[in-house]
Amino acid sequence: MNIYEESLQFHKQLRGKLEVSSRVKITNEKDLSLAYTPGVAEPCREIHKDPSTAYHYTRKWNTVAVISDGTAVLGLGDIGPLASLPVMEGKSILFKEFADVDAFPIVLDTKDVNEIVETVVRIAPTLGGINLEDISAPRCFEIEKKLKERLNIPVFHDDQHGTAIIVLSGLMNALKIVNKKVEDLKIIVNGAGSAGTAITKLLLSYGAKNIIVCDRDGALNRNSTYSNPYFTELSNITNPNNESGLLCDVIKNADVFIGVSAPNIVSKEMVTSMNSDSILFAMANPTPEIFPDDAKNAGAKVIGTGRSDFPNQINNVLAFPGIFRGALDVRATEINEEMKIAAAHAIADSVSDEELNPNYIIPKAFNLDVQKRVAQAVKDAAIKSGVATI
């Protein structure tokens, strides 16, 4: 039995990976009158007078919705909301297991940006935060932007920002090994979708100066015209030397390759054309842009992938539970760049100087101390940047 067959049996036996459980026992009339009528009227009156007290009298403070329309699910693509539900259930239990955040899945039977936004806004009073998941680009950018403008609770598209945070944390540690500075790097980001865009913007916020973003047609540059406005935006904030050409052209003399694209598109010759002590994060799944052994044999110093069976897995589970834990604990109104960079530092710092080596730049997912570090770093950054409300 392979992993897929075993997982199918696992899911069939469970009939759902999460459930609603009560935090109180109702064993007599007094319990009933406290938890429900008539006593429940008093917290209702208090919340009506002061809406902020909902954080004291309900579970809003610790509740996150994992919201998807099922248009970009894993490597499966647009499989629709119902078929995406097992993924959203899985995400929800990771929130609970790793950071004690009460998360529940909501899948929406619409692809319309405005319908999704309006639906989420209408259910937001229940929530302390919103995790957007597996929504296709470029719609995901617009949905997140509109929700952030209209809501005063954290809205976080994990496929974008969770991936970007782990990439940055890995790069922080990789740079210690190769003894290079971020501002001196030539970085190639291959893939201009949700993850590639977020990675690029976070690296720029961190201090990178020379990033070239490639899509299937080559480097985004200011000599080209794009129908996708997000490509135009990327071309205006990256590629300072306005290089053009295919990936094989612009990767020459690069220090870092970050792939969120397609399998087997990086050759050994391309790696050899990069600068010495190159760093490659080849994150296409299940087949990376180049396999680690091939990259290493071609001269790469540090290699990461999206797979657990190779060293240095770029795994979002290291980020999103602790990020929401920290944001919820200080009732942050958003998750900003300062909080993301703080999370990346916390993850990177979870690998000690003694442990750090080319095959270990990112901590293991089951090191639960990482989530505590991330939560604390995010809390501190939220307070310092002025988005914490308690």
Give the positions of each predicted feature:
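N-terminal ligand-binding/catalytic initiation module
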Residues: 1-155, 381, 385-389
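Adenosine-phosphate binding glycine-rich loop
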Residues: 158, 282-390
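ADP-ribose/adenylate-binding Rossmann-like module
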Residues: 131-134, 256-310
